[in-house]
């Protein structure tokens, strides 16, 4: 049920656009997988969940956070009117039930959890591998403060580009995105982290469904320096 799941995502700890049905379906179409959303219910209420893409590779049933998606993974409903110990115990029990299901259903699981999910003990207690990652979160609402945080040399490059007539413009040219993507990674020995056709399909799906917008940096004489895709939050 898309409506039930998406309502849960919006109020859950760790809920972001990347766990919504719309995003998972875009990822499934672009990367050849099937969106799986797994819920833990109590008294008819969804209290915890996991999401990712299911694929079968080398004969193994896999559940994974898809390419070009920062995180899917675990979501937890807020626990009301309970002390921290009781809330923690309730969330751990929900995780145990989800882990039971994962171990029975899939041969391999690789999920990147949202930054808000920090307690991995239910997984490590079951001998799952857990790796710590770090990320940056920036508040874009104050443009002056954001500008002050940019490195000086980057600010210099931006000012120079403005003087040369480069400007930000909306675009829906997915082929342009792919050309620049390939041009960038063709120069690197390791190649692209995600195949160009996959990246192109994903961007096309995101733009078509209204989950994001693309912009190009273009000079007055039509030279495009870069393309960026922004994803809408909620």
Segments (PLM) and residue ranges:
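A conserved beta-strand-loop-helix scaffold within acyl/acetyltransferase catalytic domains
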Residues: 1-60, 114-234
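Acyl-donor binding region in acyl/amide transferases
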Residues: 57-128, 234
